[in-house]
Amino acid sequence: LLLTPSMAQVVVNDPVATSQAVITCGNARFTVLTPEMIRVEYSEQAKFEDRATFTIVNRKLDAPQFTKSEDDTYLYITTSNLKLKYRKGTDPRTLPASPSNLTITISGNGVSSVWYPGKPDPLNLKGTSRTLDGLMGESKRAEMENGLVSRSGWAVIDDSWASPRSDGGRSYALSPNSDMGYPWWTQRADNHAMDTYVLGYGHNYKKALADYTKIAGNIPLPPNYIFGYWYSKYSSYSADDYRNIMSDLKTNKIPTDVMVIDMDWHWNGNAYSQSEGRGGWTGWSWNTNLIPNPKGLLSEMHSQNFKTALNLHPADGINQIESPTYFAAMNSELGGKYLNDSRNNINWSLDYTDFTKSFFKNIIRDHESEGVDFWWLDWQQYLTSPYTNSLSETFWCNYVFFNEAAKRTGHRPVIFHRWGGLGSHRYQIGFSGDANISYEALAFEPYFTATASNVGYGYWGHDLGGHMFSNEELVNNPNLVLRWIQFGVFTPIFRTHATN
């Protein structure tokens, strides 16, 4: 399926549904969004969510034609494709799952089927998952989340806070925040409420995905250079190494659009980086032993028409030894609020607006002024925040970095990142992680790339050539490398990569 991105950079979303589309029945509320899509809510406190969430950002659609009727026992809502039957006064969810309190009958587009809360869907065509870290053949298939299309003719978006995502995160609400310039996470109206979207599109998969983007947000159009070739390798390259690489690419007439600088750009405690043990996976200051004039090198890259990206592992915060200047500026600005004396650092605290503003002002904007075009968010650490219950670090990093990128003038916003769950299509290109170097891993990636379109995630970028390895004979196997490159030609993001 071809997913067409939106060219518009500013899209006005409104999470409050058209009043004519909303039917309230006691502690239950139903919103008819399209003839094939109904939102089902149930709250014992009758507290319903009208704000955006991590998954859903727009409910202001024209109310479709439908009829509503009821008797002493049931409420009925009927559209051209769906018929909802709700036993009044009951929680639609039952244990075990059963059709006793709520059913939605789907008809049309080649399907006649009945859905009820908790009904399994063995025919779902799958979506994607957070990462291919450690991929060995089919090992990641079981981790793939359900997609929005199914041969059953229906699919479900469970946006309830009580239903954890695959990484343990939850779908928080988003509330306008004038201080940040974009909405910020906040608690849901009722953390125990049911909040489910039922998509009954039959076999009209294209319309299902199109209508999903109407409520979950458009897929932003990536910058043109994203679709060129990316040079990337995990190796402690010096500035002269990069100059030689750029020269070789030109000499061999390999058109290249992006030069990725992996984690050795900063002090990282690696002997190869001559960093005297400073830093680790996380770092913010240039390793001047390798790259003595960072701004000059990035300027050279730009002069040869290379866009630049830097790798980030943010989880360990800002260390006083690795980044003394950034540490001092942020610690002074924040009044020592997030200081961890035992580790000599400022804790990573993107949950909070004051930390986020200081971090972007002092560190990220500084590097962007040097010439960094976009960021590779290589989050591999704890999956949920240690400070905010079930806040997904992957999704929240993606959300914040993309919204901050949108503030830059003259740049179409883009980040390179792992999938953070439904809603991540709004941050349009993905990094699939550290796959194993093997024929089995390569064989799985075309399937994995294609199914991601079933959640609107159309632009996976893989480590072409693989990264991790257990079989040394395959690491530089020319046939395997060639076949991976052939696959890369038809992959949305053409980025070769390798271990050091």
Language model features with spans:
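N-terminal signal peptide c-region/cleavage motif recognized by signal peptidases
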Residues: 3-5
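Aromatic- and carboxylate-enriched substrate-binding clefts and catalytic-loop regions
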Residues: 115, 255-500
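N-terminal small/glycine-rich loop or linker at the start of catalytic domains
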Residues: 219-232, 336-347
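Catalytic and substrate-binding clefts that recognize carbohydrates or anionic sugar/phosphate headgroups
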Residues: 69-223, 233-234, 239, 246-251
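A low-complexity, Ser/Thr/Gly/Pro-enriched, surface-exposed linker/loop concept
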Residues: 33-72
